[in-house]
């Protein structure tokens, strides 16, 4: 399955929640009507969604939120299942530990897509070495920095200013003046993806 490159608001409207695919520079309400699905007739009434349909929607929601395709998403699920602890919570922690997501959480990119582009354009260093694989998993204590030649990019400074005004998550520590940050730990489940029911994703893959 190819990566979706169409309107981002359409995906958020389809899932009925903000997938954080757009920059927070403007309120999402001014861009997307989340209470209506995309299409000519919008949300239909009276039709009950099956359990399978609900489970599939939750999986699609997670995949779209983190910008991950099916093959890679399944790999994360298999790894989450292999590890100790709650499979659904571990799955979300793995997604949160992706390099592109951590770059986004640190405020270097205003969206995950923008953060992924910074990684693919070799603007990011991980522990002092250039990192250009968005799916790399970051570990507690890892240091992420903007490469020297990329520090003049205006969009990075704008994103950092925006992140500072909104507030950074507690599991990252960022020195905006040096454009460097530390991944302190994987986030607690209660702090991320609050509109996702990951247990339905586990049920879907367990069918």
From Swiss-Prot:
Q: Using the chain's own numbering, where are the disulfide bonds?
A: none
Highest taxon of the source?
A: Bacteria
What PROSITE patterns does this protein map onto? Answer: RIBOSOMAL_S4, S4
Q: Which Gene3D superfamilies match?
A: Ribosomal Protein S4 Delta 41, Chain A, domain 1, RNA-binding S4 domain
Q: Name one GO molecular function term.
A: structural constituent of ribosome
Which keywords fit this entry according to its UniProt record? Ribonucleoprotein, Ribosomal protein, RNA-binding, rRNA-binding
Which segments constitute the S4 RNA-binding domain? 97-162
Q: Which residues cross the membrane?
A: none
Sorted alphabetically, which InterPro entries does this protein's record hold?
Answer: Ribosomal_uS4 (IPR022801), Ribosomal_uS4_bac-type (IPR005709), Ribosomal_uS4_CS (IPR018079), Ribosomal_uS4_N (IPR001912), S4_RNA-bd (IPR002942), S4_RNA-bd_sf (IPR036986)
Q: Indicate what this protein is called per its UniProt record.
A: Small ribosomal subunit protein uS4
Q: What is the organism field in this record? A: Bordetella pertussis (strain Tohama I / ATCC BAA-589 / NCTC 13251)
Gene it is expressed from? rpsD
């Amino acid at each position: 399955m190819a990566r979706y490159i169409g309107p981002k608001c359409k995906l958020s409207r389809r899932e009925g929640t903000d997938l954080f695919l757009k920059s927070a520079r403007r309120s999402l309400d001014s861009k997307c009507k989340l209470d209506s699905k995309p299409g000519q007739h919008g949300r239909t009434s009276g039709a009950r969604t099956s359990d399978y349909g609900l489970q599939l929607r939750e999986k699609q929601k997670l995949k779209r939120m983190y910008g991950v395709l099916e093959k890679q998403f399944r790999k994360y699920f298999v790894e989450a299942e292999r590890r100790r602890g709650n499979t659904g919570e571990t799955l979300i922690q793995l997604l949160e530990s992706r390099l592109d997501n951590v770059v986004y959480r640190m405020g270097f990119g205003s969206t995950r897509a923008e953060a992924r582009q910074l990684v693919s354009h070799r603007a990011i260093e991980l522990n002092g070495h250039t990192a250009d694989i968005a799916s790399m998993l970051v570990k507690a204590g890892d240091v992420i920095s903007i490469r020297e030649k990329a520090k003049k990019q205006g969009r990075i400074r704008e994103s950092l200013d925006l992140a500072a005004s909104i507030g950074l998550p507690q599991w990252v520590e960022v020195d905006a003046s040096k454009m460097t940050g530390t991944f302190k730990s994987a986030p607690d489940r209660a702090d991320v993806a609050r509109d996702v029911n990951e247990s339905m994703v586990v049920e879907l893959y367990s069918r």
